[in-house]
Amino acid sequence: MTIKPSRSRTPFKMVNFRFLEYSVEALKAIFEEATGTPGQNIARKNHLTYFEEYFRVLKAKTIIVETPYVDHDFLEDFSAYYVKCFRSYDRFCSRLHFLNIPLSSEFFDNILQSGSDSISVKELNDAYLGFVVVKPIPSTFIGRTCLKTYAPDGERSFPFTHEYEVSLAGLSLKVKSLAYQEQDSIVAACASTAIWTAFQATAFLFQHHVPTPVEITKAAVRYFPFSNRNFPNKGL
């Protein structure tokens, strides 16, 4: 399905949604298509192994692929580094939504148009497992990610999770999580990304601004003029 943008003086791309049956093979193919990373490299990523087990436990049934998606954090990365590269990089990401129920585009259209289907928006929200932003860069492409936690079993504790609001084709959904993303060795190494994740918790508790990973890196090196350039970044 395709969502047309509202009228504006600024040209926008059409937002498209693809509905796929979940499988780790489908997820791997999406990563390969969205990033241009060879399949064998994706297969070696620990993230794919992690997602496979995680979505098995959460009983994922459907992937909704939203393209193009504008991600604030990556847009900052893009303007700080990628737009200046000799190689041309896209500034638009993809966002993958996961559900624990089967869902087709036709069925979703009915929900949007009439809201009278057997599955309500509330039931859709109950089935929502969260999202993964896929950045259009090779290798370190896992962007802002908010996924539902494992069910409480007395052994795991998630004290700093909170609700994130998600707009899916205009439908307001929520997922209780703590956002994280893969470290980007170009603009934000492990320390910057770890601080960004910590800020996801403290911002909810103390109502402060969450700087992007590239802003964290810039702040860290502002008063320490290293001999090497800041980007690509080798760590704080």
Task: Please provide the spans of the model-predicted regions.
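A sequence-composition feature that detects small, non-aromatic residues
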Residues: 26-29, 34, 43, 60, ...
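Active-site nucleophile-adjacent alpha helix/oxyanion-hole segment immediately C-terminal to the catalytic cysteine
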Residues: 3-6, 10, 14, 156-228
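Active-site-proximal segments of catalytic enzyme domains
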Residues: 228-236
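Long, charge-dense tracts
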Residues: 1-146
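Cysteine protease-like catalytic core of ubiquitin/ubiquitin-like
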Residues: 124-173, 177
